[in-house]
Amino acid sequence: MRQIFSIALLLPLAAWPAAALADDPPAAEAAVLPAAVGAPRDVPYAGMIALRVTPDLDHHVFNVAETLPVRGGGPLTLLYPKWIPGTHSPEGAIAAMAGLTITADGAPVPWTRDTVNVYAFHVDVPAHAGSLKLSFQYLSPVTSREGAVVMTDRIALLQWWQEVLYPAGYYARGITVRPAFDLPAGWQYGSALEEQSRGGGTVTFKPVTLDVLVDSPLYAGLYFARWDLAPGAKTPVHMDAVADAPEDLAIKPEDLQAHRNVVTQSALNYASQHYDHFDFLVAVSDETSSGLEHHRSSENGVPTTYFTDPKKDIFSRTYLMPHEYSHSWDGKFRRPADLWSPDFNIVPERGSLLWVYEGQTQYWGEVIAARAGLQTAQQFRDYLASTGAELQAQAGRNWRDLQDTTNDPVINQRRPLSWRDWSRAEDYYMEGALMWLDADTLIREKTNNAASLTTFAQKFFGIDDGSYKEATYAFDDVVGTLNAVYPYDWAGFLRTRLDTHPNTALLDGIERSGWRLVFTDKESDLSKAGSALRKVHSFRFSLGLIAAGDGAVRAVSWGGPAYQAGLSAGVSIVAVNGTDFDADTLSDAIKKAQTTRAPIELLIHNGKHYRTVAIPYYDGLRYPHLERIAGVPDRLSDIIAPLK
């Protein structure tokens, strides 16, 4: 009976596949996509947008009220900025935009988010409406775990692209906005925007086009100071600073002069000024984080010791403010054609020339900082040594060329990387700077100092002095100007350094400048300052690791001794050769291993587990420095000599 039942049970199962085949559903097909948001047109938008931002200091929220003029009913698409100039990436803060409501004549107007382009909101405008009133909040990070903190009970750092919706279909320069900001009682502000009126705590600014608004951040604070960096000049330049505490704004006279020198040296380097006024916006704070370039201003976040104890903050003084200022010429006035976008959403940015936009700016930032006196010649050389050593040791240069790293802002958007040493990340800054040092020293050598990269900067960025209308360029324009300075195979020079891996010419500029990279067992003051700022101890060029004071491993060099021993970031060093870990103990162990030739034993803690690893490393402590090359002119000193 059991056997008969089993056979009967199997019969319909055996017959099932044939029946099922006859009734199979049709093959899957892709769903129809919604119509794409139309490309922007270079025509003016009728009317003026009124935009008002009110900070909620207790909750780190920016409240936005916007009035958008409309004509006639029908479909309208509103866009929240996605591609942010200066970040080179689609990192618009759409996830932090909340509470959107739209009304017309007091009645609610429904909206629908585009299911593909989530930065777009579709609205059916009522036929009778003359304007739409929009209300929403930008929920700024409350802690650094969520992102850069831009608001405290004493500081508010406002970037307008986080607080505006704009109509699709228009170039940003065709949309006019009248911005306003509700200034907390007792606060002051700095911005490139020009004040039109003030009443009841609300500051209303003169109308500007949307592209200018997005390019004009506002820094406000309870503790505020403003300094004239170009006294008596026809083109005003100021430094506007907000701070955690009033004492953080005490600047020494010689330090103020060094910042004034940045303005003077930059104008000489570029033989032009492409703004009608400029404001360095500075947040002197250990609580907030900021930094971005703009055409008539710059955002600069610095530690609370920046003015009061410059020796503690050597690291950020090596390039930061001159770098962001240089972007007014390199990146804002003259902009790579594929990075210029008519709006902030529909036309994506591409960064194929970031080695000019950021790489040459990085170079000039370091050079101008030295020329101005923000850093000493020794600090400049130490920074250069650190850069050269870091890139020389970087394993990722063996598989990935410099040109490909210009895609990183889109690929990664500065998210943390497990193995940055192997993957690489935005190396067009530092390796780009070394490439431009290479070009500078080559021009100086071949012309017997009759020309230099400053000559290039004056020709390339110095056109149309006084204009701040963007002028775009392509690779051939860069090559053409270099050839006008000194005829050479500049296309080959650049493409060799951009497209090969590894780039064996990495240190050519340093050596042609009359110096060479060497390693000793002494760490430079600049390196110590950088480590102190990050609260780590660097053994990058010896064991191939960086550790915090408590032994937590922050980074491991791909393929280095620590890597070969099985270490990675995230583990902790508990003991060194049987003694509790501290940086001095590890340093001593590295030194002793040179003589004893005995592997260095580390007790490693990872989660709930412990293990001991032995690292057979016997080459001692290694820290980078520059050493003079006899018989080669000291072109490096010529490069950082102040311009007259």
Locate the predicted segments by residue.
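Juxtacatalytic substrate-recognition/specificity segment
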Residues: 66, 228-354, 360, 364
